[in-house]
Curated annotation (Swiss-Prot):
Reactions this protein catalyses: 1-haloalkane + H2O = a halide anion + a primary alcohol + H(+)
pH effects: Optimum pH is 8.
Name this polypeptide is given: Haloalkane dehalogenase
Species this protein is from: Mycobacterium avium
Function field: Catalyzes hydrolytic cleavage of carbon-halogen bonds in halogenated aliphatic compounds, leading to the formation of the corresponding primary alcohols, halide ions and protons. Has a broad substrate specificity, which includes mono- and di-chlorinated and brominated linear alkanes (up to at least C4). Shows good activity with the priority pollutant 1,2-dichloroethane.
Keywords: Hydrolase
Subunit details: Monomer.
Keyword flag Hydrolase: yes
Gene3D superfamilies xref list: alpha/beta hydrolase (3.40.50.1820)
Length: 301
């Protein structure tokens, strides 16, 4: 496995990202250790909130949520998935698998001895985070899903997804900043777009971003389906608090909250919402999301 590491100079003077970098080595069951970057802000003994990003972003996506959450006394942790942000980037699409991504994040949880966290997930963060919540329930005490789902290949996949999958794999360029700007309601400035482009100096660094759409299970024959279906069954017994906050203007996942709310017992009576946002809901409504999490957290005390 050939691994790339984005130069630190790419992350200097980013717009609205004053956070300290932390690193640790993570492993999957069949790979050597890789360096994962993460943010760890707020009091070390505060209630832990973990924020998981998705495709093709990194912890930069959470920059407007972190300070309000830490100002309220929470410890906020936001890792960059392997292949993204300041984390190591295996250089081949074939180096990535759904199971490896789950393993890498579980390894990160284990190294930091995290348990009873409030877990906020979006996009691929939900595909990973929902598996972890189901398979290691002691690690997650409260669960928030925003524009996410757990694929079990039991529903029709929208044609638009297959177009996105082909684009991600074969397009000569994969402009992360432009992708984010298309998936938002509000205008994304050139400086912010540059923040999303920062992890990828050139296309050789983008194998992880190109791999993600290929790894979404759409067929019952996909190797991830047995574990995902088992996790879905476990979520059907999840009685801890579950909250769905979705972007009403997300063209693909804007209504994916309904199956989650119906299936997960812990969703009953919670203040679920569809807000004026598109797919990158954190970019559209980051401070509002933070406020909703804090209000929910307070109500659960």
């Amino acid at each position: 496995m050939h691994v790339l590491r984005t130069p630190d100079s790419r992350f200097e003077n980013l717009e609205d990202y004053p956070f300290v970098a932390h690193y640790l080595d993570v492993t999957a069951r069949d790979t050597r250790p890789l360096r994962m970057h993460y943010l760890d802000e707020g009091p070390i003994d505060g209630p832990p909130i973990v924020l998981l990003h998705g495709e093709p972003t990194w912890s930069y996506l959470y920059r407007t949520m972190i300070t309000p959450l830490t100002d309220a006394g929470n410890r906020v942790l936001a890792p960059d998935l392997i292949g993204f942000g300041r984390s190591d980037k295996p250089s081949r699409i074939e180096d990535y698998s759904y199971q490896r991504h789950v393993d890498w994040v579980v390894s990160w949880f284990e190294h930091l001895n995290l348990s009873d966290v409030t877990l906020f997930v979006q996009d691929w963060g939900s595909l990973i985070g929902l598996r972890i919540a189901a398979e290691q329930p002691d690690r997650v005490g409260r669960l928030v899903v925003a524009n996410g789902f757990l694929p079990t290949a039991q529903r029709r996949t929208p044609p638009a997804f297959y177009a996105w999958r082909a684009f991600a794999r074969y397009s000569p360029v994969l402009p992360a900043g432009r992708i984010v700007s298309v998936g938002t309601v509000r205008r994304v400035s050139s400086k912010v777009r540059a923040g999303y482009d920062a992890p990828f100096p050139d296309k050789t660094y983008q194998a992880g971003a190109r791999a993600f759409p290929q790894l979404v299970p759409t067929s019952p024959a996909d190797p991830a389906i047995p574990a995902n279906r088992k996790a879905w069954e476990a979520l059907g017994r999840w009685e801890k608090p579950f909250l769905a906050i979705f972007g009403a203007r997300d063209p693909i996942l804007g209504h994916a909250d309904s199956p989650l709310i119906k299936h997960i017992p812990g969703a009953a009576g919670q203040p679920h919402a569809r807000i004026n946002a598109s797919h990158f809901i954190q970019e559209d409504r980051g401070p509002e999301l933070a406020e909703r999490i804090l209000s929910w957290q307070q109500a659960l005390l």
